[in-house]
């Protein structure tokens, strides 16, 4: 026997038993962005490597360690996309979507990062994101946060997630704070872990995000970014908080919150949970007003967020919120004998035409009554429709209930659609 080929480490199959939960999550996401009037954008999985070096930043873990990068046959450096924002900006610039226009966009699809695989974190993962362009005011920041809060409400997990909020100010304010933070870190350099020492000059704000307990202890006396904000940035953050208060979205201001990507300014946020251990962040985003120009477009304000679907699915499973996921089949049609096969197929086809939302599975491959009922039960269907020679002669179908103790009954062929519509509504 030939050796079986396995999936690549960190790249998982989503099996038929798992896909209904994924479909439920995806349906909630699509319905939520539709309620806010957002439009879908789809971008290639493979992009020029320079796109991510220029947007994410060359001195980041993603670019330095995690990207899947290769040369094609022309010698061009290409990369499997590690996130969706840069591709969305590239597409917007390329197709003239962002020039003096407002755009509310969303995307969903696979991303790739060469990280250490663990529960809720994979090398191929599925990301859902929202991006808004052309609006610089705090009300749109509030809107994307309201949209994200709606997701949790519709998924039934609002009580299990918390919003953390911060502001990074504008580039000039952040530059002044950066110098003050570097000066502070230099005084404690010998106590910093290796990763923080490496980031101290290239990306010092990321030191604030260190998980090292000793570094966090040192940072207790570090200068605060809030003290370096100008009036405009302070007012933007104050207005955002006022709007969130007005609509009843609770949050916690976290002055240590920074984002792992270089392009963020002003508003940054994360939704976190205590239910997933170390994988606590379930959605993150913020404002990135400089990225469109950085990638060759005109100065354009922008704000958005992204979430990993694997982590959302894991959270729903951890909280045992998967019980209401319906089976893939409503009705199973079985022929009791070869002479009834054509009639059974016709019944199934008619039901699919008259009841488009009814999920009908036909038994194929023959077999005795016991085998067919076993397959019907395994399909998850509510009922099996049995068609034998007697049913054929009388113009009826026998309805056998699979999920309760109701006695089976006969239903006239011409009344079957109405009967099933009432039964499965």
From Swiss-Prot:
Family, according to the entry, reads as follows: Belongs to the class-II aminoacyl-tRNA synthetase family.
Q: Name one GO biological process term.
A: histidyl-tRNA aminoacylation
Please provide the record's keywords in A-Z order: Aminoacyl-tRNA synthetase, ATP-binding, Cytoplasm, Ligase, Nucleotide-binding, Protein biosynthesis
> PROSITE patterns of this UniProt entry?
AA_TRNA_LIGASE_II (PS50862)
Which Gene Ontology cellular component terms are annotated?
cytoplasm
Gene source species: Shewanella sp. (strain MR-7)
Highest rank taxon of the organism? Bacteria
Name the UniProt record assigns to this protein: Histidine--tRNA ligase
Q: Which PANTHER family match?
A: HISTIDINE--TRNA LIGASE, MITOCHONDRIAL-RELATED, HISTIDYL-TRNA SYNTHETASE
């Amino acid at each position: 026997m030939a050796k079986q080929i396995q999936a690549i480490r960190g790249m998982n199959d989503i099996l038929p038993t798992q896909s209904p939960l994924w479909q439920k999550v995806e349906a909630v996401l699509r319905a939520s962005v539709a309620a806010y009037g957002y439009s879908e954008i789809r971008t290639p999985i493979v992009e020029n490597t320079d796109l991510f070096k220029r947007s994410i930043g060359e001195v980041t873990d993603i670019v330095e360690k995690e990207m899947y990068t290769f040369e094609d046959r022309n010698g061009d450096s290409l990369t499997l996309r590690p996130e969706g924002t840069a591709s969305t900006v590239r597409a917007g610039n390329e197709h003239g979507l962002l020039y003096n226009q407002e755009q509310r966009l969303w995307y969903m699809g696979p991303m790739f990062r060469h990280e250490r695989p663990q529960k809720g974190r994979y090398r191929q993962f599925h990301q859902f994101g929202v991006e808004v362009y052309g609006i610089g005011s705090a009300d749109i920041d509030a809107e994307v946060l309201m949209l994200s809060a709606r997701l949790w409400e519709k998924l039934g997990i609002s009580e299990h997630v918390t919003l953390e909020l911060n502001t990074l100010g504008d580039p000039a304010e952040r530059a002044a704070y950066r110098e003050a933070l570097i000066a502070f870190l230099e005084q404690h350099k010998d106590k910093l872990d290796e990763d923080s020492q490496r980031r101290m000059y290239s990306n010092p704000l990321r030191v604030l995000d260190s998980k090292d307990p000793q570094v966090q202890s040192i940072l207790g006396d570090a200068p605060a970014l809030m003290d370096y904000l100008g009036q405009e940035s302070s007012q933007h953050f104050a207005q955002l908080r006022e709007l969130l208060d007005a609509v009843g979205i609770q949050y916690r201001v976290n002055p240590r919150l920074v984002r792992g990507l270089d392009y963020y300014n002003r508003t940054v946020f994360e939704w976190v949970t205590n239910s997933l251990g170390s994988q606590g962040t379930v959605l993150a985003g913020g404002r990135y007003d400089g990225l469109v120009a950085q990638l060759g477009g005109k100065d354009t304000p922008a704000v958005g967020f992204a979430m990993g679907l694997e982590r959302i699915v894991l959270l729903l499973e951890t909280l045992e919120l998967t019980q209401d996921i319906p089976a893939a089949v409503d009705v199973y049609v079985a022929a009791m004998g070869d002479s009834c096969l054509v009639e059974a197929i016709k019944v199934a086809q008619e039901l699919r035409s008259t009841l488009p939302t009814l999920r009908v599975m036909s038994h194929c491959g023959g077999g005795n009554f016991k085998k067919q009922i076993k397959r019907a039960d395994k399909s998850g269907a509510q009922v099996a429709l049995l068609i034998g020679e007697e049913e054929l002669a009388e113009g009826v179908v026998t309805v056998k209930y699979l999920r309760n103790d109701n006695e089976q009954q006969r239903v006239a062929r011409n009344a079957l659609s109405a009967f099933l519509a009432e039964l499965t509504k």
